[in-house]
A protein has these predicted regions:
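C-terminal structured domains
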Residues: 10-14, 27-94, 98-99
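C-terminal extensions of enzymes
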Residues: 76-174
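Catalytic cores of alpha/beta
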Residues: 5-19
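Gly/Pro- and small hydrophobic-enriched strand-loop and loop-to-helix capping segments
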Residues: 18-28
Length: 174
């Protein structure tokens, strides 16, 4: 499951419902004989940082490093005990798979607790909707500053989440 799929648990938890879905745009469902042929293997995945404010994950290199140089890191940084690895100067060698995993869980857990503290389902949906809108605004600021994020780091998933929440509100009468 990718990072965006993990973060999808936020709108789902807002209403204790599985009315939301987020996929890989059917690219993993396409059958290809090449998937079954012997290969030499792939490379290690590129290191990522889960951004609560963006509700996505960013590449450590070049995205976190560049956003830090542009003084935009505070706007995308999650509250995490592992931030000392990315600031004041990024040390990507210390950002191990274990730390990345623990950081990801920490961010998701913090967001879930914050959302659950909102009380009613309507308040939870308002909260998560506001978080998504703020994330979209932060993406807009990054784009206006002339920095293009990797397609997997971008905010294209946010509009789908807003539409799903809106549809759910309509169907549930919330």
């Amino acid at each position: 499951m990718g990072n965006k799929q993990h973060l999808l648990s936020l709108p789902m938890a807002a209403v204790s419902n599985a009315n939301f879905a987020c996929g890989w745009y059917n690219n993993l469902k396409a059958f290809s004989e090449m998937n079954f042929r012997t290969s030499t293997g792939g490379r290690r995945p590129r290191k990522r940082y889960t951004s609560g404010p963006l509700m996505s994950s960013l590449l450590l290199l070049p995205e976190i490093a560049t956003l830090n140089k542009m003084d935009l890191l505070p706007q995308v940084e999650s509250e995490s005990p592992f931030n000392n690895i990315i600031r004041p100067i990024l040390n990507d060698a210390e950002w191990t798979d274990e730390i990345s995993c623990l950081h990801n869980w920490h961010v998701i857990n913090s967001l879930l607790k914050e959302m659950e503290s909102q009380g009613s389902y309507a308040n939870r949906l308002d909260y998560i909707t506001n978080r998504i809108v703020r994330a979209s605004e932060t993406y807009r600021i990054i784009n206006e500053r002339g920095f293009q994020l990797d397609a997997k780091s971008g905010g294209s998933h946010l509009n789908a989440w807003l539409a799903a929440i809106s549809d759910f509100r309509t169907q549930a009468g919330i």
